[in-house]
Amino acid sequence: MDRSLRLSYRYHDVDVVELRVSGWNGRFGGSTCLYIGQGELANSAMVLAGFPAGLEDRREITLGAFGSDSAGGATNLKLSCVDGAGHCQLHVTIEADYGHQDLLAERVEMLCDFEPAALDEFVEQMRELNSSLAGSAVLALLERRN
């Protein structure tokens, strides 16, 4: 299995888009299906574009909705620089749908290393996915540094 974070198109109507989010960092992984509003991927791509602008740069996006009050799952992506050399880290949280009678949802949190050039490609793929409503956006991840 490749180390990656993948956003894959599943379905859309006039209001919402359904995506499958899956991630694997070489040690931990998870996936969920979630719902976002039309155009939300383009907005998220704008937030992530140009990262990192400096060593103190931090970015965060959430897709879907966490908790039992909404249908579908959710993911949260927090990006940061971890050292003076500009190494980048992604903290990913993926939560599954609670289902009809579930009191808890499955959830995974993982840390991932990535290169800024890979994020640039991911951002472009997010924009394409937003406009075409087909395919996937894939962020290639690196083996974790200790």
Predicted regions and their residues:
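Short, structured motif recognition centered on aromatic/hydrophobic residues
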Residues: L41-L48, L90, L119-L129
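Short acidic, glycine-rich loop/turn motifs
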Residues: G23-N25, A65, I94-H100
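Intrinsic, low-complexity N-terminal interaction/targeting segments
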Residues: Y11-E18, A74-D102
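Mixed-charge, glycine-accented linear interaction segment located at domain edges/termini
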Residues: A96-N146
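One face of beta-strands
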Residues: R3, V17-V21, G30, D57-R59, ...
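Charged, alpha-helix-forming regions
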Residues: M1-N25, G30, L34-M46, L129, ...
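Short, well-structured hydrophobic secondary-structure segments
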Residues: G29-G72
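Preference for bulky hydrophobic residues occupying beta-strand positions
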Residues: V21-G23, L34, L79, V92, ...
